[in-house]
Amino acid sequence: MSAQDFLVELGTEELPPKALASLGDAFLAGIEKGLQAAGLNYTGKQVYAAPRRLAVLIRQLDVQQPDRSINIDGPPLQAAFNAEGEPTQAALGFAKKCGVELAEIDQSGPKLRFSQHIPGKATVGLLPTIVEDSLNDLPIPKRMRWAASREEFVRPTQWLVMLLGDQVVDCTILSQKAGRESRGHRFHHPENVLITTPANYVEDLRKAYVLADFAERRELISKRTAELAMQQEGTAIVPPALLDEVTALVEWPVPLVCSFEERFLEVPQEALITTMQDNQKYFCLLDSEGKLLPRFITVANVESRDPKQIVQGNEKVVRPRLTDAEFFFKQDKKQPLETFNERLKNVVFQAQLGTVYDKAERVSRLAAFIAPLIGGDAQRAGRAGLLSKCDLATEMVGEFPEMQGVAGYYYALNDGEPEDVALALNEQYMPRGAGAELPQTLTGAAVAIADKLDTLVGIFGIGMLPTGSKDPYALRRAALGVLRILIEKQLDLDLTGAVEFAVKQFGAKIKAPGLAEQVLEFIFDRLRARYEDEGIDVATYLSVRALQPGSALDFDQRVQAVQAFRKLPEAEALAAVNKRVSNLLSKAEGAIAEQVEPKYFDNANEFSLYSAIQQADQAVQPMAAARQYSESLARLAALRDPVDAFFEAVMVNAEDAKVRANRYALLSRLRGLFLGVADISLLG
């Protein structure tokens, strides 16, 4: 079957830059879906996305659908005809369903059968519907209409190219009649561009100063920006999302170096970077020490004969932005940071939980409680907690919300606060996302944990639990943040005590029985997904969860130990034994004695197991005290042989009540050794 390249390009007014790449991918996916549904084969595919166009190239597409045959079985012959040979309603209904007369139905087999040969259609006739369906299915939250047209799309359409081989596909889509004329760069090549064949699409547009390939433009911008930064003895800050957005804004990218006055460097560099990235889409430059240079890179969409004009224009545009940041910084510094706390009395945190001022007071007390438990200073943590929300009332954060915490850090330093107190004002929000940076100071860790626990307890206390995808207070992220800080920073905090302390801080604002237990369960449930992401089996998590350790660090150490234990050759058998022992002990009548009485042994294997348990107990006690859980389980693995021998030779449920009770006590000692680490009976 012959094949030809297929190209479709929809020209529009400027598309939303943040959505451009995803729109292109969805356009390609929709066309592929349509081609596959039509049974059309092809050898390759490529999507192109630029500010004013979405295009898809399909290589070596079948020009004709393959013929196909359909066979539909109907009712059995005995149900299709009565004794007189007349057709029944079942037969007539089947023929009607197939859209033919009963005489056209095959009656030679055990059942009625309708067979039909369907010749394949020409691909050129199928493509308009496939393209139109793909465009209709694009993920566009809000479509628009334009002029007198009743068509709807993300932006007004301007032209349409559709070629199968070197022939135009005759159709009209979104009010645009298909042709072979595209458009070049607005300024460098305002004339139409004749697309000779689909294979020549990219090069035809390149000659018209349009780089249609999103990936090519992105790579060019990234590479050229790095080169220019190196020439300035700096490194460019190139966040992937910003790079994608800039790529979506230009058809013919030309990166240029611009500068601003050095006096602006007295302003916190985070504020300058924020305004240059978010508002102007510039790439900022850092020196070798990570400090902001008074230069930045803009990406022009034209190759100017006088690039200085573009540079000067961008420098002129950014100056008022930087001047605003400078003004806010100077204004805020005119008064101590602590004085902004008063303004927070009028800022509601949550209607039932009080103001942001109230929250800061609670965080201060909770941070002071937590700090000494993780090796920090209670006084400094309390001070940091008290100042933690002050910058929310500053002009800087009012203009640049991303500066919360960062602004507080600079203002605290300006007021002469200790370095760790100042750092904690920014670190309280860490981690800001999955895999993001953690607090580096103990003061910051204490405030970060306190802030998150206060939110968890408060929101749970008023019954606003997260459901499904709805989590307006980001409680899942808060819980994961607490766990990451404690585990990755190796901080041994008893969360039970911390959560109970947090509950008390709310006083009469919340009355929820079992609130502390509910919050703790929610926090530790977050570990399940964390371990699954790390490839740790859920049974390992559950074996530790059964013991309900209050320390996240201790929990993690136990999980890692169980994971290592499961790789030992004895693990499976010992897990099965523990499960058997657990079942036996659960059926025991009355309390199980704590002491084992050797005088009731009547089998050598009882003595052997008892001796092995005694030796193991002495060996693992110091290990358990030092939380050497892996070493402890490795030592307990040596119990496999005496345990196997015991169960092979000894009937646990002996007729003599004292012998039976003593054997239960022996098995309880055995199980207790393993429960010092985890309930490995759950591993089976």
From Swiss-Prot:
Pfam families: DALR_1, tRNA_synt_2f. It is an enzyme of class 6 (ligase). Keywords: Aminoacyl-tRNA synthetase, ATP-binding, Cytoplasm, Ligase, Nucleotide-binding, Protein biosynthesis. GO terms for biological process: arginyl-tRNA aminoacylation; glycyl-tRNA aminoacylation. Transmembrane segments: none annotated. Its EC number is 6.1.1.14. The keyword Nucleotide-binding applies. It is found in: Cytoplasm. GO terms for molecular function: arginine-tRNA ligase activity; ATP binding; glycine-tRNA ligase activity. SUPFAM superfamilies: HD-domain/PDEase-like (SSF109604). It comes from the Bacteria. It catalyses: tRNA(Gly) + glycine + ATP = glycyl-tRNA(Gly) + AMP + diphosphate. HAMAP family: Gly_tRNA_synth_beta (MF_00255). Tetramer of two alpha and two beta subunits. Belongs to the class-II aminoacyl-tRNA synthetase family. This is Glycine--tRNA ligase beta subunit. The gene is glyS.
